[in-house]
Amino acid sequence: MDPLLELLKTTVARYTMLSPGQTVVVGVSGGPDSTALLHALAHLRAEWDVRLVAAHLHHGFRGAEAEEDARYVVELAQALAIPCRIERADVPAMRRRMHLSAQEAARRVRHAFLRRVAADVDAQRIALGHTRDDRIETILLNLFRGTGPEGLAGFPPVALPVVRPLYEVSRAEIEAYCQAHGLQPRRDSSNLNLEYRRNRLRTELLPTLASYFNVKVGDAVLRMAGLVSADNEFLEERAAEALEQVCLARSDAEITLDAQVLQALQAALQRRVLRQAVAKLRGHLREIGFNLLEQALEAVRAGETRQFALPADGAQGIFLRVEASTLRLSIEPAPAEGCPWQQMLQVPGRTEIAPAGIAITARICPAAGLEPEDRLVFRLESLALPILARSWRPGDRMRPRGLDGSKKLQDLFTDRKIPRA
């Protein structure tokens, strides 16, 4: 039997990825990894008694090249007698609307598409073509970003319904398999763009590390990840138990933690408990950095009253408020129709508002020495925290200082000859 098929069978069995009678949606981009995955699973489907459905998303990037990718996937699926689902998405528009990177927008749309297909065909599993090399690259990128133990463990082989049958297969083994079976997968030209950090890591940094430090740098990275993963699994279980003890109240939109009980935990558990609480509300931890959570925990330890606005996830984010006895996490309201952005402000602190290209800094200062002539000063006790900042919309009014009554913002803009954006 082909070496890749043997390794794939071992991996699937080791991690209990598939069971007889299941339907498996296979994400296929047309590149070497997913092409080899679909072809290999087709060879093993009868032995495993699984039904396969290929799924390909046209992201709306790369023009004619993407059209050829879709055509290739359809022809490959037909040759293997596998039903195929193709869908087109306007990822560039979604990226602009939600202010995301191209890769993040594509990832979100792609995962939503695969889950829709899985629901439509009553599939129990979604198989992705992530390889051993992808694991190494992801771990190193996480390391350079300043990740904690969770990021150093890399992505898991199984995160139901997602499974990764090529988890232990190298990119070189993929290429050898494609050549041995006469497969001619598509080559994504964007993989040559060194503006993307992953591409630069793959083509420049990893070869340099292998040449000057350790020819088996990938093995070393994965060995470390394996050790970290085992420790991480144990600590995550402990943190889940601690979260139940710390949690005072929970709903779909809010979680309240006992700050004093949280503070009594070991530091490693404190961070993990807070991460798990955020993940339960947000569904994931992408863009939630170490520094932000650590600042919240420092406020708990100091007994301070502070508030933090976690990065927004499209229309929703998490607002975190630390008080003397509680730490409360709540989902921010979705922006109102016609309101391009809205965000909770950190008081005190600095809040980046990417859609507007601005940052708002709030400080708590003693009243003495302030010059009210050239700035607005508010009494802290008179403010209803949290403070929500948003872009203006038609009909908004304000009370300008020195003016008796209110005035429409639109009229103020007209008076000052401020053009519409």
Name these PLM-found stretches.
Residues 191-196, 219-226:
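Internal, active-site/partner-interface "lid" segment
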Residues 4-32, 53, 57, 89-91, ...:
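AMP-forming adenylation/ATP pyrophosphatase catalytic core
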Residues 208-220:
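Inter-helical turn/loop segments and adjacent helix faces that build the functional surface
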Residues 188-192, 215-218, 286-287:
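Short, surface-exposed loop/turn segments at secondary-structure junctions
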Residues 1-28, 32-207, 237:
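Core alpha/beta nucleotide-donor-binding catalytic domains of modification enzymes
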